[in-house]
């Protein structure tokens, strides 16, 4: 009997109905979005919107496209990731359509639907073409170079609403920083995975914190400082805060040292205080946050933040109903930065709770997929991408609710913004790919030629016909950093000390009594 598959169910029973569950959830997500679309039309125009059928058909086609890509290339992926993304995207489209009724001359929902289609198309391309997420590890330095280049380019373009984050060419505009955040996350994950042992165990100890050696931590800190510096020059402090949060999370996951969280919070507070004093654009936002009702007292009317707070208060527990709010009073950026205020007013605390649970579930499944892997790069990549979504939701929701200063970022999938929705779909595609690797069942030991002897060690007169890198991803003997190396991905390490008794992907093998220990115990009792 072979150890890895002794208790495994037959191959046909390992993943019962996973894609069927996903398809059913997708149908529910499309149905909820279409019903909300119709509800808005009935509330505002006393009639079903004329394009409701085409809207539903388009959203269903996008959901089906994503489902087919996952079914054929990532059959073991988490069945919740794609439906949650489709539901969030559908809710965003119906909210933008609802706000378009307030500004008929400036309709944004058709354009947003096109961007959503492009995002789902890229989702399918990534899932179909990226067969192994470890491929990205080979292009770590290409990723950081491309990411920094994308962040530098907007400096040479005019500022829009006080920030230099846009590139406008022939009426077409996009935010390159949205794509840069994925590229820099790939670099951070690859670099920290390759150097995690040195980061965790070398360096000087100060107070109760052990700091890594400068030669190890220096390159990644330099890249982070450059990226944050560029963002400060562009006055895009929301994205700089996002990079900082993700960097601290990845550093903690790579080293396992909680002290980095404390250091990160202290540095964030110091940096925010310094920039808030030195940068007028940021200083005004901090002043609005500290005194949101000052403009009312001065007789200038309510500020955007004050109107946002009034909208949340008007929503109460159950909301005013879709299409029954007064979000137009927010004015500028009601479809982007302040779209959450519309959601809170019309669906209330109950709707907000459901929305935040969707985001929490999406982030949690991303973390789960990463932590189920024994590949350090895959683990850090999934955690980093999920953290991008988590920090972004916190920064935006905290800003419009008055918990922190406004940052001008876009709520994932919900707010108007083509660059944002496309980037978020790529993030979900990468999480789907990592999830498929983490959930893929074990191969048959007879097929791989790996025969387990006593204690889980390999035995046999001849070597197995497959090397570790020849097996499907996750079927190796230890941490697969892309070259069969252990603990950091350095090649050439022997497999003897790689936790041979553990199943791949972080799934622990069942505890079995050691016969030699039993004999020793019996002898001592005699």
Predicted segments with their positions:
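Hydrophobic alpha-helical segments of polytopic membrane proteins
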Residues: 214-277
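Long, low-complexity, intrinsically disordered segments
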Residues: 466-526
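Loop-to-helix entry and N-terminal half of a specific, functionally important transmembrane alpha helix
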Residues: 367-408, 414
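Transmembrane alpha-helix boundary/anchor motif
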Residues: 64-68, 187, 273, 277-281, ...
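Hydrophobic alpha-helical transmembrane segments
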Residues: 57-62, 116-122, 345-364
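Hydrophobic, glycine- and aromatic-enriched re-entrant/interface helices and adjoining loop segments
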Residues: 160-166, 170-173, 260-355, 374-381
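Membrane-helix boundary/helix-loop-helix interface segments in multi-pass membrane proteins
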Residues: 7-59, 64-234, 397-411, 416, ...
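Interfacial segments of multi-pass membrane proteins
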Residues: 241-260, 326-351, 409-422
């Amino acid at each position: 009997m072979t150890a890895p598959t002794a208790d495994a169910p037959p191959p046909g029973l390992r993943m019962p109905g996973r894609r069927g569950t996903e398809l059913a959830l997708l149908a529910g997500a499309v149905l909820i979005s279409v019903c909300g679309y119709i509800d808005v039309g009935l509330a505002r125009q006393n009639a079903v919107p004329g394009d409701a059928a085409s809207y539903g058909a388009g959203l269903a086609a996008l959901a089906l496209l994503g489902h087919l890509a996952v079914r054929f290339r990532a059959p073991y992926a988490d069945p919740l990731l794609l439906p949650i993304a489709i539901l969030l995207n559908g809710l965003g489209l119906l909210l933008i359509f609802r706000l378009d009724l307030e500004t008929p001359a400036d309709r944004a929902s058709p354009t947003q639907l096109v961007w959503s289609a492009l995002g789902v198309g890229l989702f399918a391309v990534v899932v179909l073409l990226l067969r192994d997420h470890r491929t990205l590890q080979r292009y770590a330095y290409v990723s950081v170079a491309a990411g920094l280049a994308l962040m530098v380019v907007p400096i040479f373009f005019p500022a829009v609403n006080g920030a230099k984050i846009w590139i406008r060419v022939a009426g077409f505009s996009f935010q390159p920083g949205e794509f840069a955040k994925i590229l820099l996350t790939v670099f951070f994950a690859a670099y920290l995975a390759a150097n995690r042992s040195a980061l965790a165990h070398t360096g000087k100890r100060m107070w109760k914190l052990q700091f890594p050696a400068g030669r190890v931590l220096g390159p990644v800190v330099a890249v982070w400082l450059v990226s944050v510096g560029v963002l400060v020059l562009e006055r895009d402090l929301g994205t700089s805060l996002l990079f900082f949060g993700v960097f601290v999370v990845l550093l903690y996951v790579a080293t396992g040292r909680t002290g980095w969280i404390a250091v990160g919070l202290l540095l964030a507070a110091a940096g925010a205080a310094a920039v808030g004093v030195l940068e007028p654009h940021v200083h005004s936002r901090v002043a609005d946050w500290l005194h949101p009702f000052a403009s009312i007292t001065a007789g200038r009317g309510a500020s955007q933040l004050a109107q946002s707070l009034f909208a949340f208060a008007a929503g109460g527990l159950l909301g005013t109903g879709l299409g029954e709010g007064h979000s137009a009073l927010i004015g500028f950026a009601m479809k982007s930065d302040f779209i959450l205020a519309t959601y809170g007013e019309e669906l209330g605390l109950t709707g907000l709770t459901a929305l935040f649970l969707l985001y929490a579930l999406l982030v949690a499944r991303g973390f789960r997929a990463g932590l189920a892997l024994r590949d350090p790069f895959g683990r850090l990549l999934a955690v980093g991408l999920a953290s991008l979504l988590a920090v972004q939701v916190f920064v935006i929701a905290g800003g419009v609710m008055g918990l922190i200063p406004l940052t001008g970022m876009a709520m994932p999938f919900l707010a108007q913004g083509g660059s944002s929705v496309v980037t978020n779909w790529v993030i979900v595609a990468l999480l789907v790919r990592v999830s498929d690797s983490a959930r893929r069942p074990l191969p048959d030991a007879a097929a791989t030629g790996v025969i387990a002897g006593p204690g889980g060690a390999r035995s046999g007169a001849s070597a197995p016909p497959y090397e570790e890198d020849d097996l499907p991803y996750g079927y190796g003997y230890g941490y697969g950093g892309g070259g069969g190396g252990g603990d950091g991905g350095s090649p050439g390490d022997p497999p003897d000390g790689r936790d041979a008794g553990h199943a791949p992907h972080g799934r622990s093998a069942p505890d079995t009594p050691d016969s030699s220990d039993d004999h020793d115990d019996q002898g001592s009792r005699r």
